[in-house]
Design a protein with these regions (language model features):
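Acidic, low-complexity proline/glycine-rich segments
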Residues: 1-14
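Type III/flagellar export substrates
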Residues: 11, 15-209
Length: 209
């Protein structure tokens, strides 16, 4: 459960006892899996900002669609949808905010970079890199601290304004991965509603999934 393995042991004439030991390999694998999924989303967003736009390809009308073959419609739609988020300030701001959020320390736990998880060069944007040795050492030393730093969730979550004192306190008590994914999900949902992309946006589905 969350990288913690429960082991039941029974000695002669002794009632069963439950010993809880951290499954360190499972914790590492969970973190690695999350980082890989997160990086995939970030790279998709970065690609969308740089994607070429074909301004001459306007959305087809119903009449125009009927005059074209299924293949022609598909190719036209791909061109029309390409570059919708090219140089989009909102997406760029989301990526910038996510990168900044990665540096924020978690109250009562630690910071992402103490665990050997970094963003590398600025050109890499918010893409994460793992120092395997440093992360495994951190897990071996204090697995609960690692889990809290990344996945901690406040006991009583409220919908406070982000910049209010309550909102800042709640954010400070939320694990880095949890709050970053919340920021990404909220930002992409806002873009989808604003641009009319809808809930079928591929990036939005990746975040929600």
């Amino acid at each position: 459960i969350n990288g913690v393995q429960l082991t039941l042991k029974k000695a002669d004439n002794v009632v069963n006892k439950v010993s809880v030991s951290a499954d360190k390999d499972a914790i590492y694998d969970k973190i690695k899996e999350f980082v890989e999924g997160y990086n995939k989303i970030v790279k998709s967003m970065q690609d969308k900002v740089k994607e070429k736009a074909f301004r001459s390809y306007e959305p087809l009308t119903d009449t125009e669609r009927k005059a074209l073959s299924e293949t022609e419609v598909k190719l036209w739609d791909e061109k029309a949808k390409s570059g919708l988020l090219n140089s989009d300030n909102t997406v760029s701001n989301i990526l910038s905010n996510v990168r900044s959020g990665l540096y924020e320390k978690v109250e009562g736990a630690g910071s992402l970079f103490e665990l050997g998880i970094t963003t590398g060069t600025y050109q890499n944007g918010a893409v994460l890199q793992i120092d395997e040795k440093k992360l495994k050492n951190a897990i071996a030393k204090d697995p609960q601290k690692v889990l809290d730093t990344l996945f901690k969730s406040p006991d009583d979550i409220k919908d406070h304004p982000k910049n209010s004192a309550e909102g800042k306190a709640q954010r400070a008590n939320t694990g880095v991965f949890v709050r970053v994914m919340e920021d990404m999900s909220n930002g992409i949902t806002a873009i989808a509603k604003q641009s009319g992309v809808g809930n079928e946006s591929s990036i939005l589905q990746q975040v929600k999934g």
